[in-house]
């Protein structure tokens, strides 16, 4: 009998599925276009997006994440976004527990 995936393995599977869901909207499931990025941010990270006071923040994020400057995010570039957000959330959590 096969073992069930661990919580970490399920998280990885979820990240892959979310990337594929958003990358596949325009037919290319290997990269997220700018339009797909905006949809991703407004649906999957809606609270983060809605809390931004600067309307240009998403454009700047896309440019900063797009390391090869092709106007799209591959899976590694997508993971850089997720990792950066996870670090920021962890830092916030640590600060809140030290009060």
From Swiss-Prot:
Modified residues (Phosphothreonine): 8
Protein modification: Phosphorylation at Thr-8 significantly suppresses homodimerization and promotes association with NCL/nucleolin which induces nuclear translocation.
Binding-site list for Ca(2+) 2: 66, 68, 70, 72, 77
GO molecular function: calcium ion binding; calcium-dependent protein binding; S100 protein binding
Keyword entries, A-Z: Acetylation, Calcium, Cytoplasm, Disulfide bond, Metal-binding, Nucleus, Phosphoprotein, Repeat
GO biological process terms on file: regulation of cell population proliferation
Binding residues annotated for Ca(2+) 1, in chain numbering: 29, 31, 36
Gene3D superfamilies: EF-hand
UniProt keyword Transmembrane helix, yes or no: no
Occurrences of domain EF-hand (ranges): 10-47, 53-88
PROSITE patterns given in the database record: EF_HAND_1, EF_HAND_2, S100_CABP
Function: Facilitates the differentiation and the cornification of keratinocytes.
PANTHER family per UniProt: PROTEIN S100-A11, S100 CALCIUM-BINDING PROTEIN
Quaternary data: Homodimer; disulfide-linked.
UniProt name for this protein: Protein S100-A11
Organism: Sus scrofa (Pig)
Name of the encoding gene: S100A11
